[in-house]
């Protein structure tokens, strides 16, 4: 059985992980569906798959990674994992993962009547679920599933060197847990070097050393696939990487888990906007009052 991935871009924005609204982590990036369905006359496989999804969604409220096996019979058992980005809070992780089971059915088809596909993967911007039937052919953790590159080159003579340094920081960061954006449940790193913002994430099943190697391989593929493009995202079987170049410097980027800081920023903006509104209102009132007084003065001057 060979897993055939069918890829498409549902939403494209730059930078991919950096400056995005709170709901963007639920946007669909790609899906992969096996070209074979599991015969399921008794409905056992479908029930195991349903139980698998229920367990994965439940655990996503407490952690950013889990691996689950549903069923005991080798012919109907299902193995699955979910992984959330390291900068998502538990509530965001749950919100993201809980969207996927219905998407699997919608994008890959299946059900008790016509059988479910024996393996599938649905990847959103902030999380993914992948599952496979017991005994399904295993693929390399560094097999490339999907990539997207920016349409423009950086036009910066020093870009390659800056990107290389940023890549090195990420490779070390996913191994040591050193990150500007949080982590947990698989190596995660988000940070910047000069004008390059970079992100790396591994599946929680990888150890630190394997994670570093996977991310390194991802960045090598990003260089070969995207050349000097100003941005790129590469998704491998067990890790994914992203980079974005900003000609005027990386803007202030908050991790999605920085709730307090973001709320404080939002309050500051709200106060600033409110202050501008009040100031404008006062100015208008003063202008009206001045106009009225001027008319009154002109009236007296006429006598």
Curated annotation (Swiss-Prot):
First-listed, main subcellular location of the protein, grouped into a coarse class: membrane
Effect of residue 289 to A: No effect on targeting to plasmodesma
GO biological process, one term: defense response
UniProt-annotated location(s): Cell membrane; Cell junction, Plasmodesma
Location of region: Necessary and sufficient for plasmodesmal targeting: 269-289
Membrane topology: Single-pass type I membrane protein
Effect of gene knockout: pdlp1 and pdlp3 double mutant shows altered protein diffusion (measured using GFP). In pdlp1, pdlp2 and pdlp3 triple mutant there is inhibition of GFLV 2BMP tubule formation. Virus cell-to-cell movement is negatively affected. There is a 22% reduction in mean surface area of infection foci by GFLV and an approximately 12 hour delay in long distance movement in comparison to wild-type plants. There is also a systemic delay in systemic Cauliflower mosaic virus (CaMV) spread.
Gnk2-homologous domain sequence ranges: 27-136, 141-248
Induction profile: By downy mildew fungal infection.
Disulfide bonds: 33-108, 84-93, 96-127, 149-226, 202-211, 214-239
InterPro entries: Cell2Cell_Antifungal (IPR051378), GNK2 (IPR002902), GNK2_sf (IPR038408)
Residue intervals annotated with topology Extracellular: 22-268
Signal sequence, renumbered to the chain: 1-21
Record-level GO cellular component terms: plant-type cell wall; plasma membrane; plasmodesma
Family per record: Belongs to the cysteine-rich repeat secretory protein family. Plasmodesmata-located proteins (PDLD) subfamily.
Subunit-structure text: Interacts with AZI1. Interacts with PDLP5. Does not interact with DIR1.
Function recorded in the entry: Modulates cell-to-cell trafficking. Required for systemic acquired resistance (SAR) which is mediated by the signaling molecules azelaic acid (AzA), glycerol-3-phosphate (G3P), and salicylic acid (SA). Required for the proper localization and stability of AZI1 which is involved in SAR. Mediates callose deposition during downy mildew fungal infection around haustoria. Haustoria are unicellular protrusions from hyphae and function as the site of molecular exchange of nutrients and effectors between host and pathogen.
Protein name: Plasmodesmata-located protein 1
Lineage: Eukaryota, Viridiplantae, Streptophyta, Embryophyta, Tracheophyta
């Amino acid at each position: 059985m060979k897993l055939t991935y069918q890829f498409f871009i549902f939403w494209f924005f730059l930078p991919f992980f950096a400056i995005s609204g709170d709901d963007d982590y639920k946007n669909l990036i790609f899906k992969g569906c096996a070209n074979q369905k599991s015969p399921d006359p008794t409905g056992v496989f479908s029930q195991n798959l349903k139980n698998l999804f229920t367990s994965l969604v439940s655990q996503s409220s407490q952690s950013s990674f889990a691996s689950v096996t549903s069923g005991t019979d080798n012919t109907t058992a299902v193995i699955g994992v979910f992984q959330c980005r390291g900068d998502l809070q538990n509530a965001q992780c749950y919100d993201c993962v809980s969207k996927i089971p219905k998407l699997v059915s919608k994008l890959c088809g299946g059900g008790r009547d016509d059988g479910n596909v024996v393996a599938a993967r649905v990847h959103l911007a902030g999380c993914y679920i992948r599952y496979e039937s017991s005994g399904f052919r295993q693929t390399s953790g560094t097999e490339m599933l999907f990539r997207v590159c920016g349409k423009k080159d950086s036009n910066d003579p020093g870009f390659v060197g800056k990107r290389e340094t940023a890549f090195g920081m990420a490779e070390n960061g996913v191994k040591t847990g050193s990150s500007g954006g949080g982590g947990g449940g698989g190596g995660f790193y988000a940070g910047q070097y000069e004008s390059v913002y970079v992100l790396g994430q591994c599946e929680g099943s990888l150890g630190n050393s394997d994670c570093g190697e996977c991310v390194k391989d991802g960045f090598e593929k990003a260089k070969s696939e995207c050349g000097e493009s100003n941005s790129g995202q590469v998704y491998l079987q067990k890790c994914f990487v992203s980079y974005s170049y900003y000609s005027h410097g990386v803007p202030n980027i908050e991790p999605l888990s920085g709730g307090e800081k973001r709320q404080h920023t939002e309050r500051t903006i709200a106060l600033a906007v409110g202050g501008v509104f009040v100031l404008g209102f006062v100015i208008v009132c003063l202008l009206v009052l001045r106009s009225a007084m001027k008319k009154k003065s002109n009236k007296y001057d006429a006598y």
